[in-house]
C-alpha cells in the first residue's frame, strides 16, 4: 500500500471526500476478512490510514476503485511511477497487493521506502499505533500490523507489512539505529512473528561489536 498512497498523494485526490464501500471491494481472490461492511462510508484519508497502518485490503481496493479514471488508470499510474523511480523489476496489476502477479525486489523496495519517507502523511499513518473510525454509527478500532511501532526501543518513521502465501510475511521499515537512518526490507518470513524477530536480530547485529553468528540448519 506504500506505493498506492504515493500515487494518491502525487495526484492530489481529495482526501476528505467520502467513499462508500461496495461489494466490488470484497476480496474474492484470497477471501481476506474486513470489518469495513459493504454500504459503509469513510473519508478517503481514513481509508488511506487503515490501508497503511492496518493493511486493510478492502480500504485499499476502495481507494483504487474510486481513483479518477478507475482501477485501470490507477494501476497504470502505479506502474508509471515505478518506472519513474527506477524500480525496473516491479510490476503491479492491482491496488491491494493480493495478486501474486504483483512483483518487486528488495532493492526496488528500498527505493520505494526512501521515496515514500519524504511524505509526512505516509510516515504518520504508517507508524500510528491505532486508528478509530465511525462507520454507520459504529466505532471500529484498528491497530498497527507492525508491533514494533509500539516498542519504545525502536525509532521507526515508516512501516508497512504485507502477506500472501507466495511472498510470505513481509516487512519494510525506515528506522534510526544508533542515530543512523536505515531502510530494512524483510521478505518471505516464515512465521507470524519471524519478521519481528528478524528485525530485532538485524538491529542487534548492527549495534553489537561482535555480530552474532547465523543460526545453523
Regions found by a protein language model. Give the residues of each.
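Penicillin-recognizing serine hydrolase domain
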Residues: 44, 70-217
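Active-site-adjacent loops and short helices of periplasmic peptidoglycan-processing enzymes
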Residues: 1-107, 114-120
